[in-house]
């Protein structure tokens, strides 16, 4: 493969990761707007949001087989175009049932895109001279920042929700037009003609890395959904500071992902993954134990540093392990990861209600210790 062709392959992956982050960040500010438009209560809105997870859980296990049959380019392009139409629909509909239907489709499209873009990223990394997975995930984080900021800027300048949404969707369409033709035509680098199983079930070391990913996604979901409540109710800070913790966490993660590939080249995947887990555990302990505001905010920065490159390292390893084809392994790991996102924050709510939020976050720290031990065992087994 010519160098210029490889560079375009790499740029196309960056573009699609940015698109995925932009899509999620376009929907997030619409949540309170949709809730207000429908005139529904929090519990109904929660059930509607669950539709995204249900849609993702339906499509993710199937996407590995789809990528092998149709190739990354076709699946990513179809999923991206679907998301454009769905997001526009969500900016318009006024029926609870229509919103539920659109969110199911949105979750399915996001699930398809998430799995296939990581398959494409792993396959491109395998033909690249050095590790670049963390950089790709950094582009996803960049898309989230740009999308959220762009939507807020549009609304603050008097644009309607429809117009703000359309601006984001035009950017997404431009990304598809520029990069879709540079994506990989295949979705599996194995030479086997054997038909891929319809549903990806983890096998071998993929089982262990699925658990590792599930815990990482659970922790990310916990920080996203519960950090504001922890800051305001446990540390008794002003409600205006509720979003500060997650913002600091996200900024740290973004910065460290762009430096993650250099860290992997210098220190190795094992050191980056295990070191990150230890750092994130220390961040949670600082959050629980610190009586000072500066310690609280520092803890979120430490968590972001620690968690930033764990998932990129796992996806990179999925392209090198031999227990499952890459496409199936990534689909399996992604599915279990999203189980953590869906179930983790809800479990924290139940535990917090029965005990306290401090104890619930302490259990997360224990889970990270377990995650570290599992990862250490798997790397030892691989060696």
For each predicted feature, which ranges?
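Helix-loop-helix hairpin linking two adjacent transmembrane segments in secondary transporters
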Residues: 135-184
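Helix-to-loop junctions at the C-terminal end of transmembrane segments
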Residues: 59-71, 256-269, 352
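Conserved MFS/SLC helix-loop-helix module at the cytosolic interface between two early adjacent transmembrane helices
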Residues: 58-97
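Helix-breaking motifs and short loop linkers at transmembrane-helix boundaries and internal kinks
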Residues: 39, 71, 92-97, 236, ...
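Cytoplasmic helix-loop-helix junction between adjacent transmembrane helices
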Residues: 103-138
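Interfacial helix-cap and linker-helix signal at transmembrane-aqueous boundaries
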Residues: 34-35, 66-67, 153-158, 231-232, ...
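Extracytoplasmic gate region of multi-pass secondary transporters
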Residues: 27-28, 202-247, 251
């Amino acid at each position: 493969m010519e160098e210029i062709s490889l560079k375009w392959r790499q740029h196309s992956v960056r573009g699609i990761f940015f698109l995925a982050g932009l899509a999620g960040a376009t929907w997030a500010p619409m949540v309170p707007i949709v809730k207000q438009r429908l005139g529904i209560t929090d519990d109904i809105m929660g059930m509607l949001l669950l539709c995204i997870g249900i849609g993702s859980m339906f499509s993710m296990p199937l996407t590995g087989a789809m990528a092998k049959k149709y190739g990354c380019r076709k699946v990513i392009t179809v999923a991206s175009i679907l998301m454009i139409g769905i997001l526009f629909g969500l900016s318009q509909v006024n029926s609870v049932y229509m919103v539920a239907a659109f969110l199911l489709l949105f979750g399915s499209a996001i699930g398809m895109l998430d799995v296939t873009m990581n398959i494409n990223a792993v396959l491109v990394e395998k033909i690249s001279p050095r590790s670049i997975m963390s950089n790709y995930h950094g582009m996803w984080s960049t898309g989230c920042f740009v999308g959220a900021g762009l939507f807020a800027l549009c609304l603050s300048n008097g644009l309607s929700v429809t117009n703000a949404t359309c601006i984001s969707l035009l950017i997404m369409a431009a990304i598809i037009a520029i990069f879709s033709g540079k994506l990989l035509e295949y979705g599996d680098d194995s030479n086997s003609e054997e038909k891929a199983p319809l549903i990806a079930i983890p096998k071998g070391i993929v089982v262990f890395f699925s658990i590792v990913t599930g815990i990482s996604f659970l922790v990310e979901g916990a920080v996203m959904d519960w950090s504001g409540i922890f800051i305001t109710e446990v540390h008794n800070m002003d409600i205006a500071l509720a979003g500060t913790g997650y913002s600091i966490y996200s900024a740290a993660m973004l910065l460290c992902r762009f430096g993650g590939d250099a860290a992997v080249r210098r220190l190795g995947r094992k050191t980056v993954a295990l070191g990150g887990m230890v750092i994130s555990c220390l961040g949670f302990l600082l959050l629980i134990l610190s009586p000072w505001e500066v310690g609280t905010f520092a803890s979120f920065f430490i968590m972001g540093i620690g968690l930033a490159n764990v998932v990129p390292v796992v996806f990179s390893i999925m392209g090198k392990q031999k227990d499952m084809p890459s496409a199936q392994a990534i689909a399996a790991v992604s599915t279990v990861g999203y189980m953590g996102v869906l179930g983790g924050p809800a479990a924290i709510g139940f535990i917090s209600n029965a005990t306290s939020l401090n104890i619930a976050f302490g259990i997360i720290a224990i889970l990270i210790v377990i995650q570290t031990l599992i990862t250490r065992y798997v790397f030892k087994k691989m060696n």
